[in-house]
Amino acid sequence: MSQLKPQEVVRLGDIQMANHLPFVLFGGMNVLESKDLAFEIAETYIDICKRLDIPYVFKASFDKANRSSLHSFRGPGLEKGIEWLGDIKKHFNVPIITDVHEPYQAAPVAEVADIIQLPAFLSRQTDLVEAMAKTQAIINIKKAQFLAPHEMRHILHKCLEAGNDKLILCERGSAFGYNNLVVDMLGFDIMKEMNVPVFFDVTHALQTPGGRSDSAGGRRAQITTLARAGMATGLAGLFLESHPDPDKAKCDGPSALRLSQLEPFLAQLKELDTLVKGFKKLDTH
């Protein structure tokens, strides 16, 4: 067994991620649709987060490898996608998070991305976990829809044994019958007991997998309710995807927040986060 323990506070430059500190935002778009759109979304997030004093990391995927159809849009691919993300990072001086799907991608992605993300569907794939951990990048581990919160410790142990203690756990909902996800609010506390920063992916928790026959549906109208509920538990951060016109987004539009609503949405969560973390902790054991 590894002697390493997860870092309770994960640091990325001036950004500190911990469950007791002001929340950090991993935000952006689902998949890189075009370079111009990525720049537009990044600039909008950056401007709003500066006004609201929210630490920010830009998120976008270069490839969506688990689409429902062979004909679904997947993105620009590894080479061009990493180039675009690197350009955004350099132009805006903003940290980057993106996901990795295969072991060979881990090293080149980690050269550009500050945080590399382990997809929920792939979170038990040992070769992928080990390759990602060995990059020494911060790893955002998505909780699989089919795993209980307490089972996430096994994935943490794999990363620690591969020599990486810069780990984040991210809730994104649990399978509830067919074509539905629910979020167990008690699961946040279970994962926080593992002494790692815990984030909430409110976007993908709103999915209805396979709900549109050839793609996932979503419940965008309920995003405020779910985000408030999750952030009220006291979390290290929020994962959020937005789009100027979600109904025309090339992936997961039904779950994406309209970009024009981003500032009032985040302002509410900022106020809630400050309130919750100002409460005195009660020992109810």
UniProtKB/Swiss-Prot annotation:
EC number: 2.5.1.55
One Pfam assignment: DAHP_synth_1
Family: Belongs to the KdsA family.
Pathway note: Carbohydrate biosynthesis; 3-deoxy-D-manno-octulosonate biosynthesis; 3-deoxy-D-manno-octulosonate from D-ribulose 5-phosphate: step 2/3; Bacterial outer membrane biogenesis; lipopolysaccharide biosynthesis
Substrates-to-products reaction catalysed: D-arabinose 5-phosphate + phosphoenolpyruvate + H2O = 3-deoxy-alpha-D-manno-2-octulosonate-8-phosphate + phosphate
One Gene Ontology molecular-function label: 3-deoxy-8-phosphooctulonate synthase activity
Lineage: Bacteria, Pseudomonadati, Pseudomonadota, Gammaproteobacteria, Moraxellales
Designated gene of the protein: kdsA
Subcellular location as annotated: Cytoplasm
This protein's name: 2-dehydro-3-deoxyphosphooctonate aldolase
Gene source species: Acinetobacter baumannii (strain AB307-0294)
